Amino acid sequence: LDRSSAASDVYKRQLWDKLKCVARRGDYAAPDADLLAQNRMAAGIYLTCQGLPFMQGGEEFARTKHGDHNTYRGPLELNRLDWTRAAQLEELVQYYHGLLEIRKAYPELSGMAGDAEPCILSLPGWLIGFVPERQGESLPGRLAVYYNPECTRQWAALPAGSWRYLCDGTRAAAEPFGPACRNAIELAPVSVTILKVE
């Protein structure tokens, strides 16, 4: 058994703990709406990027080790998965589930479908938007992805077509939902939005 610190990263600080630490909000077990939005955004970013994603067990319910960054020899209370948090943060669990279903249903997000480079959309400020694949020069891809790191709602132009949500920043599903959008879309604060063309 290799007990060196290089053997594994599972004892490092969890995403939730990192968010709490950076925000200097000490009660690691307490839910926090702002940090839950950041947690959803982080998951939305890495699950819409090319390559194979890696997430730590329990991330989908904001697993915490109460700020302890090295629990290698720590007690079971810190190293176990606290399933009561999964019940308390069911909406976050469902969000992760939806993102994973989207990634499974749309292989162009992973880059594993052999698609061309994503088409980056021209957007103002800190907004990022892209179409994961191209279908010729004049046709948009079937998906559009937007990242809004701002703490306020932002407007972004849409590629041509009629678009519906797969992810609106708080809900994610492999089947489109919500009303159709054309020309522009209002992005929720601190969110990832995924749209599918009709």
Predicted region positions:
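Active-site-proximal loop/helix segment associated with metal-binding centers of metalloenzymes
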Residues: 13, 17-19
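Carbohydrate-interacting/catalytic domains
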Residues: 14, 31-198
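Metal- or metallocofactor-binding catalytic centers and their adjacent structured scaffolds
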Residues: 22-32
